[in-house]
Amino acid sequence: MPKLTQADLIDLNQTFEERTPQELLTWSKKVFADKVAAISAMQEAGSVVCHMISTLKLGIRVLFVDTGVMFQETLDTRDRLMREYGLDIVTLHPKQTMEDQTQQHGILYLTVEGQQQCCHMRKVEPLNEVAGQYHAFIGSLRRGEGGKRSFCPVLQVDTENSTVRINPLAMMSDDQMDAYVREHNVIVNPLHAQGFATISCNRCTTPVLPNEPKRAGRWRHLGPWSVYCGINPADREAGAKQVIELPQDVIDRILGREADFVI
């Protein structure tokens, strides 16, 4: 099957630096049609993407991975987005319940290595299970989050599941996102107002103090060695070969070889 490399996307990523999130979302729908889905953990940035998809009437499906140990506020946010924004949100689940996993493997999230295994089983694998239905996933990473995400591109090949990851909010600053949320009264997970800078499983997520890094509340019990869950390609160590396989017509549309798909 034809291959798409990260190097193939260099020129397009430079062009996309000048595009708005709305333009990038519209491009995503035109290029990938029903083979693109947004992924959201029901955090603030994900809600912004969901609001844009709804406002633009793009009909893009949203995938939410319910690890089985999510905060109730997160599940309530998902339900509100479905109800009030009219979104098609599909909830994905791990193969095992947390109870069954613990019985088989022990409490994985108590060690760095175990945390990586736990996140892979409960977050990454459910997404990989459906990845064959899609050519691209829309995320909500922003360079303003810092860390490894400081340099996240708009388009990135995801070798984990052979899809293109699209980050339409990559250039959006904290102030710009706050302004968008206020202006459009975006539905936001209420945990953010309780001091949670980032939100995931209730076992491994805590609020942060004003002077702490945004991700200090994730796996706090493991210190600075655990920061990311691994579901986003920008958070993983880039392999020697950043290449994925896609149908040739899809690659042609991505790279603008058909005039209708150039923006």
Protein language model annotation of sequence segments:
Residues 1-263:
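Nucleotide-activated chemistry modules centered on ATP-dependent adenylation/adenylyltransferase
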